[in-house]
């Protein structure tokens, strides 16, 4: 699956989730799209934070699932850097 195909699948699935979606609801699309640089951290039951890390493990973007403009920074990162879909540990 290419980066753009993985992102399209991930974005379509997430766009259908309610704002209060659980970490399990968010994790499924990440795993099925083969996306490895986006992680779920700070799972608080109904609120989760998505974290994007670069190849060295440094955080480059983060947002809570309830933030109204959370996707804006994420889209900038995706357009600039793409999405890692390898499965190698960092």
Curated annotation (Swiss-Prot):
Please, which domain of life does this record's source organism belong to? Bacteria
Q: Which Pfam families match?
A: DUF905 (PF06006)
| The family this protein is said to belong to | Belongs to the UPF0401 family.
Provide the protein name.
Putative UPF0401 protein YpjI
Question: What is the source species?
Answer: Escherichia coli (strain K12)
């Amino acid at each position: 699956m290419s980066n753009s195909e993985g992102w399209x699948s991930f974005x379509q699935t997430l766009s259908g989730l309610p704002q209060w979606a659980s970490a399990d609801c968010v994790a499924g699309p990440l795993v099925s799209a083969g996306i490895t640089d986006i992680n779920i951290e700070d799972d608080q039951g109904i609120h989760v934070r998505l974290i994007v890390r670069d190849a060295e493990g440094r955080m480059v973007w983060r947002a809570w699932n309830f933030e109204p403009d959370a996707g804006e920074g994420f889209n900038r990162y995706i357009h600039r850097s793409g999405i890692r879909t390898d499965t190698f540990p960092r």
